[in-house]
Amino acid sequence: MAVDFTTDELDEVASLIARSSCNVALTGAGVSTASGIPDFRGPQGVWRRVDPEKFEISYFYNNPDEVWDLFVKYLLPAFNVKPNPAHYALAEMERLGKLCAVITQNVDRLHQAAGSKNVIELHGALEYAVCTNCGSKYALAEALKWRKSGAPRCPKCGGVIKPDVVFFGEPLPQDALREAFMLAEMAEVFMAIGTSLAVYPANQLPLVAKKRGAKLVIINADETYYDFFADYIIRGRAEEVLPKLLDRLRGMLF
């Protein structure tokens, strides 16, 4: 699919980023689809094969063995992927001093794999698991070794271990959420990339930034819920738009 944006739009946004001292990016599923992670709600998404209600936090507590079996069979294989040009472009913007932070709704850790340092993970990280009883945190790979079938158990207290990602109905990690809103308040340019801005409370971040005076840039292949609120809209795929934006930004900095 051809991207639908103009050179002038890219130049304007690149100039805005170059002049600003605090630029912040909020990223969603659309940033990782080019790496091979399907949109969970899309035609090829995981929720076509697995009832998403089985990943409600209440269902997990009542049926941890079943949920772990589903997690290992359907979710884990989807995340055996590598960063794509969108991740690398954002990491390079940070290296150039033109991106304060990435706030992500993704759990794949591809931003870190691409080299991003300051990443706020609103929905947790698939790399870890946590004990639901004592709160001890483990590498997911380690927890999987303890699992013969069903849910692994905490070696410290015997509690049920859960993947350290936010399940439906579960509150977001408060430290991450607090930092995300602080960054939104500080931002001079706030970019929402690869997200439809449908999920609360992450979709409040661009509103907070805009109300504090930031310019709002939306980069997405499809329309979003807050297009009407944006200062700039670049309609295209993140992996195609961001490298071009980075090229123009470099040209303005050097």
From Swiss-Prot:
Record: residues binding nicotinamide: F40, V107, D108
UniProtKB keywords: Cytoplasm, Metal-binding, NAD, Transcription, Transcription regulation, Transferase, Zinc
Disulphides: none
The species this protein was found in: Pyrobaculum aerophilum (strain ATCC 51768 / DSM 7523 / JCM 9630 / CIP 104966 / NBRC 100827 / IM2)
UniProt: NAD(+) binding residues: A29, T33, F40, R41, Q105, V107, D108, H123, T195, S196, N220
Keyword Metal-binding tagged: yes
Annotated Pfam families: SIR2
Protein name according to UniProt: NAD-dependent protein deacetylase 1
EC number: 2.3.1.286
Gene3D superfamilies, per the entry: SIR2/SIRT2 'Small Domain, TPP-binding domain
Entry cofactors: Zn(2+)
Similarity-based family: Belongs to the sirtuin family. Class U subfamily.
InterPro entries xref list: DHS-like_NAD/FAD-binding_dom, NAD-dep_sirtuin_deacylases, Sirtuin, Sirtuin_cat_small_dom_sf, Sirtuin_class_U, Ssirtuin_cat_dom
Record-listed Zn(2+) binding positions: C131, C134, C154, C157
SUPFAM superfamilies in the record: DHS-like NAD/FAD-binding domain
Compartment(s): Cytoplasm
Boundaries of every Deacetylase sirtuin-type domain copy: 3-252
Main location class: cytoplasm
Keyword hit for Phosphoprotein: no
HAMAP family: Sirtuin_ClassU
Listed GO CC annotations: cytoplasm
Function text: NAD-dependent protein deacetylase which modulates the activities of several enzymes which are inactive in their acetylated form. Deacetylates the N-terminal lysine residue of Alba, the major archaeal chromatin protein and that, in turn, increases Alba's DNA binding affinity, thereby repressing transcription.
Cofactor note: Binds 1 zinc ion per subunit.
A GO MF term: histone deacetylase activity, NAD-dependent
PANTHER family to which the protein is assigned, alphabetical: NAD-DEPENDENT PROTEIN DEACETYLASE (PTHR11085:SF11), NAD-DEPENDENT PROTEIN DEACYLASE SIRTUIN-5, MITOCHONDRIAL-RELATED (PTHR11085)
